[in-house]
Amino acid sequence: LDHLAAEFVANGWSMKQLIRSIVLSTTYQQGETAHAEYAERDPSNRLLWQMNRRRLDLESMRDSVLAVAGNLDLKQSGRSEKIENKSNANRRTIYGFIDRQNLPSLFRTFDFAGPDTTCGRRFTTTIPQQPLYLLNSPFIEAQAKRLVESVQALKGEERIRAMFRQTYQRDPKDWELDSAELFIDQFVPYAAAWDRLAQALLVSNEMMFID
């Protein structure tokens, strides 16, 4: 912090230069890639030689799913909106209605900070309700259907590739492509197979975690 403060003053209090210094630093660009030598010396990553893997918070998770499906409403400002249990609520989560006395269960499930108390840092929990929501939520199912609709013009392998590119910004690996094709061929009823594949992509660890 002292170094950044000195740089900030030396560069004429330029926020642009400060942000540039941060985002171009080696620390900011770290990934979760393992390094055998460093892992042996510092297995707990106390010295921060790699980025600690972390799960997306509720707002980032929900907005990412909406964005990938092509449904995210980017409108700014306006009244808050109840987003729990509404499959057609496409506004950014920051505009979700918060009842201080009765926090919606969706927010509690994904570790949203209590609005009626001071919270310096959110807790991160792993509980059964989280995957149950992702697998059974009408909201997630609606976004999966929308994702399939966006690649409806493509067929077979090309549709699978397009879904991976749209979701993960990459092509599927060979084994992923083979597994997806096998899943589509064997799923009953066939008409729902693509929706289920899309849902699996949307709720996978690659989507929910930052590496």
Listing of model-derived features with the role each one plays in the protein:
Residues V9, K16, Q29-T167, D171-K173, ...:
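An acidic, gly/pro-interrupted, aromatic-rich
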Residues L1-V9, D178-V188:
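Amphipathic alpha-helical segments that form the core helices of the histone-fold
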Residues R20, R161, K173-E181:
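Short, well-structured alpha-helical segments
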